[in-house]
């Protein structure tokens, strides 16, 4: 659900997106969240 997706994106932000916002790992992580 939306809550899971939001939590997933928050985890992405903590893991990679916060350090490298445009990085491929960040994009891959968020794409994975959208697939959930």
Swiss-Prot record:
In its miscellaneous comment, the UniProt entry states: Displays cytotoxic effects on human melanoma cancer cell line A2058 (IC(50)=1.4 uM) and the human fibroblast cell line MRC-5 (IC(50)=4.8 uM).
Protein name (database record): Turgencin-A
Protein's organism? Synoicum turgens (Colonial ascidian)
**Transmembrane regions:** none
Q: At what positions is Methionine sulfoxide found?
A: 10
One annotated Gene Ontology cellular component of this protein? extracellular region
Q: Which residues carry this modification: Valine amide?
A: 36
Query: Does Disulfide bond appear among the keywords?
Result: yes
Is GTP-binding one of the keywords UniProt gives this record?
A: no
| The entry's keywords | Amidation, Antimicrobial, Disulfide bond, Oxidation, Secreted
Q: Which residues form a coiled coil?
A: none
Subcellular location(s) of the protein: Secreted
Superkingdom in the source lineage: Eukaryota
Describe its function. Has antimicrobial activity against Gram-positive bacteria (C.glutamicum ATCC 13032 (MIC=0.4 uM), B.subtilis ATCC 23857 (MIC=0.4 uM) and S.aureus ATCC 9144 (MIC=6.3 uM)) and Gram-negative bacteria (E.coli ATCC 25922 (MIC=0.8 uM) and P.aeruginosa ATCC 27853 (MIC=1.6 uM)).
Q: Its Gene Ontology biological processes? A: cytolysis in another organism; defense response to Gram-negative bacterium; defense response to Gram-positive bacterium
Specify where it is mainly localized: secreted
Where in the chain are disulfide-linked cysteines found? 8-33, 12-29, 17-26
